[in-house]
Amino acid sequence: MVTITLIEDPDGGQRRLFDDWAEVFAADGRHLFGPDHTSRSAAELREMNRGSDRHSISWSAIDGDGRVIGAACLVMPQHDNLAQGGINVVVHPDHRRRGVGSLLLEPTEAAARAHDRTLLLAETQWLAGGRDESGEEFAARKGYAGAQTILRSSLSLPADRARLAAASTAAGDGADGYVLRTCWDGIPEEWLAGRAE
């Protein structure tokens, strides 16, 4: 038996549950891409949820032994695109094709409806030259259609650390003309000219 549990306190009483929830995403990433996966850690996901630019709701699928075998979330922008919701439904690779994804999708879609999110966005991924193992077929059966293909590329840095250090501290490298600026919870008005958000 699988139980779907709402995660309401990822920093306190449900901290371990949230960590196990995040691990489902990492297990999926490792399954697909090995050590080159881009899944975020539980700490990174907690931090992302602290901003005021989005509201996230998360659920875990827990099996009869108390293990988290699936994870879902609905991410809703709060400042623009207010009809949009990003959904993520992931089942641990060892527990797929048993209905867990469908169980997780139900509360995710219900929450989207309750928050008037009429445009749901999701993504799936696979290695170049391969095929999607489960996401596209699952989504199609649930009424979703593919709309955009995005290529993910990775560039391995040279292993020569001394060469990297020299390049980053080289005199006359042109870095003096650049400034790194960071903002939280949206882009300041004065930065918006010429940018799309």
Where do the protein language model's features map onto the residues?
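Conserved beta-strand in the GNAT
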Residues: 56-60, 67-76, 86
